[in-house]
Amino acid sequence: MNAYPWLEIPRTVRFSDTDAAGVMHFQHLLGWCHQAWEDSLEQFGIPVGAVFPGGRSDQPSVALPIVHCHADFRAPMYVGDAAVIHLLPKRIDPGCFEVVSEISLNTQKVASGCLQHLAIDAVTRQRCSLPEPIERWIEASTLGQIQPL
C-alpha cells in the first residue's frame, strides 16, 4: 500500500469500457486517468467543484485545460478485471503540471496514461500560476522524492 492513499485509485473494468473484442477500448483509458485524478483530489480533501467549472459552487478563477496527453497499453484488460491506478503528479513549471497514471492488475503494469495541464485565467485565458489547492496536492504527493531544480 502506498503511503499516500489518495494516489492509488481502485477501478474495475466495466462492460461499457470494452470493445467488440471484449477488451478495454483505447478511448476509455484517458477517461480513467482523468477520473482517477478527480477521485484523488477529493480523497486529498479538495472538492472537485473548487477545481472544475460547472459545479454548484462558485466557479474557479483558474482553468486547467489538458494541453497534451498520451496513453500506452502493455496488456489487455477484460471486463471484471480489478485494476489499481497509481498517480504520479509532477510540476513542470509554475503554471503547468502533468499526472502520469500507471494502471496495474495485481503486480503487472498493463497500461499508462499521461495528462498535462496548463493553468490559465478563466476570464482572460492568459497563462497563470497553478491554483493553491493543486500546488498543495502536487507538493504532498511528491514529498520524499528528489525533484529537479
Curated annotation (Swiss-Prot):
Its EC number is 3.1.2.28. InterPro entries: DHNA_CoA_hydrolase, HotDog_dom_sf. It catalyses: 1,4-dihydroxy-2-naphthoyl-CoA + H2O = 1,4-dihydroxy-2-naphthoate + CoA + H(+). It holds the Pfam family 4HBT_2. Pathway: Cofactor biosynthesis; phylloquinone biosynthesis; Quinol/quinone metabolism; 1,4-dihydroxy-2-naphthoate biosynthesis; 1,4-dihydroxy-2-naphthoate from chorismate: step 7/7. Keywords: Hydrolase. It is an enzyme of class 3 (hydrolase). GO terms for molecular function: 1,4-dihydroxy-2-naphthoyl-CoA thioesterase activity. The active site is at residue 19. GO terms for biological process: phylloquinone biosynthetic process. CDD domains: 4HBT. Disulfide bonds: none annotated. Belongs to the 4-hydroxybenzoyl-CoA thioesterase family. DHNA-CoA hydrolase subfamily. Catalyzes the hydrolysis of 1,4-dihydroxy-2-naphthoyl-CoA (DHNA-CoA) to 1,4-dihydroxy-2-naphthoate (DHNA), a reaction involved in phylloquinone (vitamin K1) biosynthesis. This is 1,4-dihydroxy-2-naphthoyl-CoA hydrolase. It comes from Synechococcus sp. (strain CC9902). The lineage of its organism: Bacteria, Bacillati, Cyanobacteriota, Cyanophyceae, Synechococcales.
